[in-house]
Amino acid sequence: MAPKKKSNKGGKEIQSKKKIGGRKDTSGSKTPELAMVEELKEFYHKQIQDLEDRLARYQRKWDELAVQEKLFRQEFEQLANNKKEIVAFLKRTLNQRVDEITDLNDQLQSLQVAKEMEKDAFEAQLAQVRHEFQETKDQLTTENIALGIKLSSLEEFRLQKEELTEKYMALEEQLRRQEGEYKDYVYNLEKKSVLDKDRLRKEIIQRVNLVATEFRKVATNQMWETTRRAILENNNVTLQLSKVSKQGVQLLQENEQLKGAQGKLCQQLELLENTQEIMAKKNIGNQKVILMLTEKCRQQRKGTEEAEQLRLQLFQLEQNIETLEKANQTLRSEKDQLDEQLKEQRAEANRLQEELTKEQKIRTNLKTVLTQATSLLRDILQMRPETEDGDFDVVFQLQRKELLQQLLVLLSSAVVSKPQQDMGSHQDKQPAGLSKDSRLIAQTSKQGAASLLQQLSTITTYQPGDLGLVPRRLQVHIPPKPQDLRPLSCVTRMGICKLQNTTEIYPSGALKRFKKFTLPRPFLHTGRPSRCRKPDVAPVPP
């Protein structure tokens, strides 16, 4: 703001000089001394006005500083009152926290006493549970010994198992052979894929070479365009340089103007130095006031530091309380762990009891199946064909086939139910923390058992005259010639007609004429034959 006023004053001086010059021109009678006196008067008059303006401005600043000093004093007094109130509040809160800490210590002592009492009670319960577990363990060991003695009677079942294992080995050999064929097939496929990859790589290299040649052609065509662009850029640079030179000339002119203004400012600086000395004296007084304020601020900082120390003490007390609470929580977690261990032990005892009952049921079922199978085998072995007439051999074969089918159904149901139960029990017994290798072994064994069951289920009963050594062909029923049927009996003619319509042998209607024998129940749905006893088969539980 000050330089603008001075520029106005310079303009006024120039106008006054012009007026004086005009007066000189108009009044030629006045002497030059009177003109100089008038000019000095005007100059001093303007200087006095300038100084009066400055004095008014400094007076306003002094009033503003006085108002600010009053405000600072009021704020300082308010801060002192706030400090007193804060100290009183902190003292009250500290007393409250001390009371709370004493209450918490009392509660902690009571909790420790209760914890010790609960610990003693749980230890007594643990001892009782261990005693009960030992008793149940002894009972289970005795029962296992009794079951081991009973298992010695299953030697005949072991022989049948050996026969099944031999069949299983034959199937495994067949499976290995098929695996070898599959590996050869995979090798051929991999070889073919490698050859295809080489062919594709060669094609890609050829395409890359073609693209490179095309790129070179395009690059040669673009060289002319780049030179034209460089010429245009040079023209633009020359134009910019001309503009910069013009701007330099303008800056030199402005520099000369600034030098003229600098001389004027030097004159004003001399005038301001006097005022600076006056302001320095005032600043000394202000510095004394500032020192007083700094001492008061230091006192306030000391008060705040004391308050922070009190806060730190409170924080430490809160940390101690938190550590005590954490110790209490750890004790509770230990108690919960002991409870969980008790539950797990009880669950394991129940599981062992359930497994024992399942094993007993399975063994009873196997015994019943074995007794039924032995009775069926005895009946089959005791059957004897009557050799009086050739027609009775058909009935004997039908009866024998029925009994063999019943025996096969009985044994297959037992074989299917037993592995399913074993698999279910094995899945229940598997712990959650098994390694990956053991899980893979268990999965492979399950898959092998499932494949064996599927193979057993696909086995079909043999038809009479078909032992299964030769693969079956499509049955094409060719009607017999009447010339071939003439020498045959009535019974054989009816049997051939039935065979043309069905794949299995059913009793013909002509057999009902004979009164010397009776067919079995599944074919005639009448009374049981006197020669062959059909055993009652009990249902096998799943």
Swiss-Prot record:
Ranges annotated as biased composition (Basic and acidic residues): 10-27
GO CC annotation, single: cytoplasm
Biological process terms in GO annotation: sperm axoneme assembly
Single annotated GO MF: microtubule binding
Signal sequence bounds: none
Subcellular location: Cytoplasm, Cytoskeleton, Cilium basal body
Record has Cytoplasm as a keyword: yes
Keywords: Cell projection, Cilium, Coiled coil, Cytoplasm, Cytoskeleton, Differentiation, Phosphoprotein, Spermatogenesis
Chain spans, region Disordered: 1-32
Phosphothreonine modified-residue sites: 31
Coiled-coil boundaries: 33-192, 250-370
Broad class of the protein's primary localization: cytoplasm
Quaternary structure, from the entry: Interacts with TUBB and TUBA4A. Interacts with CEP350.
Function per UniProt: Specifically required during spermatogenesis for flagellum morphogenesis and sperm motility. May be required to suppress the formation of supernumerary axonemes and ensure a correct ultrastructure.
Family: Belongs to the CFAP157 family.
Protein name: Cilia- and flagella-associated protein 157
Natural source organism: Rattus norvegicus (Rat)
Lineage: Eukaryota, Metazoa, Chordata, Craniata, Vertebrata
